Amino acid sequence: MRTLIIIAAICLLTATGSGRAAANETLTDFISAQGCAIGPATLVRAAEAGHGHDAIDALIKQADATDETIRTGDWIVLPSSICRIQPPDVHSKIQITDPEVAALTSDIDGYAKLGDRGCFLDGPGLMERVQVTRGWDRNRANLEYMRFLAENLRTGDLAFYTNDPLSTPPGFQILRGDCADVPEIDAIRQSQALRDREFDALIREDAANVICGRDDSPSYRFMDLVMRRTRGENTNAWMVFEVKIMTIGGGWYVGNSATQKGTPRPPLCRFQ
């Protein structure tokens, strides 16, 4: 399988005509944000980013020296000793400063009567708005919106937060400028830090419960893992939802569209 993967990488690099990666990004940095998973989808992205097949081959050989490397289907998941899984690094054509975002964001006291202080985004409204303002179809609007969420959850400019598991936030909460002046800001920042600190361990441990192409990720056990890994320090009852949105927006799901959620790919799951 390794030989097939390397051949695929060579072909992809030839097709893109690029053998040089961005000077400020190593292959390991790139793969970390792809879930430390080397397979068909990430090989395409690695080639587009200019990472050569020799470097990919060397990384796989390094992983071969450990017993922790996972091979599942056409994928190789590198061990944490070589590569730590990071939240997906993705960039959307929708920016948080765009006028469409501002128009669909509530005032900070817009939901005060419901007991929620914060600037909440009307996500469905935003997807409809960019179809009009940018001429996108539903699938393009969905793709860029999911990327927008993943990008800004990663940077901490968005959150989906409440400490009450029986309550649902009004929407994704923007945490920039005056919109960050909310009572829960310290707890939100702590939950974001815990999420990112434990991202590698949580994804790897949860993947054993998820079958690629069949089951959902994160699994029903994810929040139990969160509480154990953070020793009960996490207060965000919706961390699992944030992680799911980040991985979908990061392209770790196959077949996601305006009408289909898609299915997870490694490292989120294992093939049977």
Placement of each model-derived feature along the sequence:
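Positively charged n-region of N-terminal signal peptides that target proteins for export
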Residues: 1-5
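Sec/Tat signal peptide C-region and signal peptidase I cleavage site
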Residues: 16-23
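Short, amphipathic alpha-helical interaction segments positioned at domain boundaries
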Residues: 83-115, 175-203
